[in-house]
Curated annotation (Swiss-Prot):
Active-site residues, Swiss-Prot/TrEMBL: S116, D213, H243
Disulfide bond sites: none
GO BP term (any one): fatty acid metabolic process
Position of the signal peptide: none
Pathway stated in the Swiss-Prot or TrEMBL entry: Lipid metabolism; fatty acid reduction for biolumincescence
The enzyme's E.C. designation: 2.3.1.-
Name of this chain's protein: Acyl transferase
Keyword terms: Acyltransferase, Luminescence, Transferase
Function (record text): Acyl transferase is part of the fatty acid reductase system required for aldehyde biosynthesis; it produces fatty acids for the luminescent reaction.
Family membership noted in the UniProt record: Belongs to the LuxD family.
GO molecular function ontology, one term from the record: acyltransferase activity, transferring groups other than amino-acyl groups
NCBIfam families referenced in this protein's UniProt entry, alphabetically: PRK13604.1
Native source species: Photorhabdus luminescens (Xenorhabdus luminescens)
InterPro entries attached to this UniProt entry: AB_hydrolase_fold, LuxD
């Protein structure tokens, strides 16, 4: 289902099992931009909505990419459910539903960009989707370590019956028991499980780390890549950045530039990101960001009026 809109970004709704809905945003390639072989799916980081990636979508669109974003079920954003019921498996279910929906629309060639916690979901999903390439940015490779850094305590070390009701993540209440039980039951929690997911990866893969990231160990990212049997993977560092890639405009622009270069390179079957890009103006990025926030608020208000 497609919602009519006066905005450049197109809102779609996927209906999934249990009468739940996943909102998907589509940004078409800029007119007269270079032709690309692949679309790009963006999986936002934890507690980040689609509109947080408005600027990146503009960069990619300006450089010829058809961009797809989505809000996971039981997450912040427009899709069904609340974040206190979010699990890694629900995140994976949401990604697979979006890929299935793209297939019905004959969008079969796509690369993936996943950041932070969503990268761990992407790592576990690649064997079930036919992606052309993968780009991650400050991606979790050791979920237990990263959660301990983010939450201030290693909650996955506790017995289930000793967990608090909720875990506070940047002001959002994550359901402790349901999240921890899913992590432990389905093997999401450590570096070894990530290596197991990625060992036989046979598509190009670029991992961006941040040299001031306190949530992800760069040496563990290197360990992950060294265990991938393919030689089509490479690591780059976003210098001057912490885990928060939007902490200032310099860091944010470097992130947009680097990911766009990686997408162009990998669309051309290369790992060297020394390529030229076209950059949107600051004014253009500001307009896109404001318009997407307005669009999100309108959709939220429509949902409230119908409830």
């Amino acid at each position: 289902m497609e919602n009519e809109s006066k905005y450049k970004t197109i809102d779609h709704v996927i209906c999934v099992e249990g009468n739940k809905k996943i909102h998907v945003w589509e940004t078409l390639p800029e007119e007269n931009s270079p032709k690309r072989k692949n679309a790009i799916i963006i999986a936002s980081g934890f507690a980040r909505r689609m509109d947080h990636f408005a600027g990146l979508a503009e960069y990619l669109s300006r450089n010829g990419f058809h961009v797809i974003r989505y809000d996971s079920l039981h997450h912040v954003g427009l899709s069904s459910g609340t974040i206190d019921e979010f699990t890694m498996s629900i995140g994976k279910q949401s990604l697979l539903a979006v890929v299935d929906w793209l297939t019905t629309r004959k969008i079969n060639n796509f690369g993936m960009l996943a950041s932070s916690l969503s990268a761990r979901i992407a790592y576990a999903s690649l064997s079930e989707i036919n992606a052309s390439f993968l780009i991650t940015a400050v991606g979790f490779v050791n979920l237990r370590y990263s959660l301990e850094r983010a939450l201030g305590f290693d909650y996955l070390s506790l017995p289930i019956n000793e967990l608090p009701n909720n875990l506070d993540f940047e002001g959002h209440k994550l359901g402790a028991e349901v999240f921890a039980r899913d992590c432990l039951d389905f093997g999401w929690e450590d570096l070894a499980s990530t290596i197991n997911n990625m060992m036989y990866l046979d598509i190009p893969f670029i991992a961006f780390t941040a040299n001031n990231d306190n949530w992800v160990k760069q040496d563990e990212v290197i360990t992950l890549l060294s265990n991938i049997r393919s030689n089509r993977c490479k690591i780059y560092s976003l210098l001057g950045s912490s885990h928060d890639l939007s902490e200032n405009l310099v860091v944010l622009r470097n992130f947009y530039q680097s990911v766009t270069k990686a997408a162009i390179a990998m669309d051309n079957d290369h790992l060297d990101i020394d390529v030229d890009i076209t950059e949107p103006s600051f004014e253009h990025l500001t307009i896109a960001t404001v318009n997407e926030r307005r669009m999100r608020i309108e959709i939220e208000n429509q949902a409230i009026s119908l409830s």
